[in-house]
Amino acid sequence: YNAPDPRPDYYRNMPSFLYDGQIDKNGNFIGKTWNGSDWTGSSLGTGFNYNGTYVGPSVDMSTYSTLTDLWTSRDDKTTQIDWDALYAANYANNANNPEGSARYMVERRHNDIQEGMLNINYRNTSVDHLTATVGLEAKGSQGIHYKSVDDLLGGNQWIDVDPFAERDIKELATNIGMTQEDINNVKQNNLANPNAAITTGGRLGYDYRINMMNAKLWAQNEWNWNEVDLYYALQFTYSSMQRTTNMVNGRAWYLARLNPDYAQYYLGSQAQNVLDGNYPAAGSALVGYAHHFIDPAFKIGATYKINGRNQLKVNAMAETKAPLARDAYISPRVHDRAIEAIYRHDQAAAYAKRDGTSWLHEYFGASQKMASADLTYSFNYPVVRGRITGFYTQFWDGTELNGYYDDEARTFVNQALTGIDRRHMGIEAAAAVKLGLYFTLTGVVSVGDYRYTSNAYSITSAENGMALAENADGAIYELRDSVLINGLRVATGPQVNTSLKLSFFHPKMWFADITVSYFDWSYLDYAPSRRMKGLYTGVRADGSAVNGWYGDTYTNAIQKDENGEVMYDKYGVPQLKYPYNMLSEQEMLTDNQWYNRFLVDVSIGKLIYLKNRQSISINLTVNNLLNNTRFKTGGYQQARLPRQTRQGVEDSQNSVIGSNVWKFPSKYYYAWGTNFYLNIQYKF
């Protein structure tokens, strides 16, 4: 708090922060100006001149090389948190400001759950060839979410205020008339206990619950004949969610005051009491609105037994699913507001009348729809057995939530995406072959194509209520835009998965196996903020203008043909020039070297039978035997866009997308190196 960010991978601590568009993605000096001519000047330290022509690197390349070497050599002081420095900062702060907040501390984020479940099933076989089943499943759960101080790192206490809100108060005060007391309220994490001094173990920041109920009523008929099996089932699901909070957040109070007609969306049913300064007593909670959903599902399937060793199976399903709480509440740490589709669902009749839509359209608008089908052929012979499956699934009206620091607004924002359609299709095959008495060879192949099949609709709002834009009448509003994701791959892991396993089993209960796996077509998760329609066209879907879009960079990043016409990809998205295309293109995670796409695992074990049906099982497993630490298991684009201020007579203080496209590099997850597991089990 009020101190430098200690994270080693914070962008200001990375080598990429030191250069200004003159290093390519492989760390090589580009050596060209943006108009393509050779650059021969000296380091001027300015980056851009007034007419927008690039004139050279803004840093000494030796400094960049030195920092890069520290990272690649895994220097502890560079790649790890300097804990000694954090303690030293807190000790100095204790001496200078003993009643103030510690500079650094370690917090613990709690995400606990309590749940209970009831299952009732009834089965009837009184009709020949028919098994009829009905069931009821009910589940109640409560998600408990809060933060606590884990370690003060030598500090005296932590003052529970929001640093982002405290910094942004000057901007907030311009939105509505605010007294000094009002301004101080905004930064409080709990208005009922302002400026609380929190010590080790104390709760801070947020403390809320999500209460969820879920009940399923279903019925299924299964028909079984000599050559054909048939089933069909129908299910209705009721679900509800409701947020309560033990803290009255100052940003929620501010947003309710800023939007009095929608105050209950931020503070729940007690909004007016809170705005009047009547905060809940200790031990009491602010209760948000309950949201209720009813979702139907239907499935049907059949099996055709060609003969005793070959058969075909086909399945189909259609259903709707209410959003999960994590995809419904925009910023539950701060306020009670949910995505817009849920309020349309809650008041379906009113919205249908207002917009001329159907009641069913509004009621099911918040639920994701899904339809799927699959076909499987399987075989089973004495020496070989296996199956091959083709599948196709279509999703409609999905929801995603994102939060990030916006460099243009200079505050933390929440982004809610709705109307997301996806298609998952592919083929899976598996076979096992016996190789003599002791060995079995098993192969598995899965090839999928998981893509987004529509663009999304985005609503972006500042968590602290800051005005992100103004309409023609000067009124503040949230940013509404399309997100151009149609055709992107869904980041669900590798879409090509293959493995070959050789297994050994001895009658004296020794067993071992070695598995070689190959993975491909793995993609980085996209950042919606980098693919907003307004960034490509200069105008958002809501009609507002964008300050600093891709066509308003120093060199106009939009790719054009020889006739000056904008070039589009096959999904209608304008193409960008290098290096700006690095900001929006989806990256494949697969390593360039083929051998880095393999993982090898081995295991060996022994089962020992004892007297009186007792036994001991010993199993040793070695994962990633070849220690392949270059294997990327996932990752994501950072949502932040590099911004810089274009200087000049006509462009003074005009914010544009900067040329240092590697300023906020993507984050990656890597496979663990070689690791061992020894499992010993005693059964009695």
Model-assigned labels for residue ranges:
Residues N224, R385, G390-N402, T411-R530:
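Gram-negative outer-membrane beta-barrel transporters
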Residues Y518-Y580, K606-F684:
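C-terminal beta-signal and adjacent terminal beta-strands/loops
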Residues A3-Y19, S148-I159, N246-A263, A328-R337, ...:
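Flexible, surface-exposed loop regions and adjacent strand-edge segments
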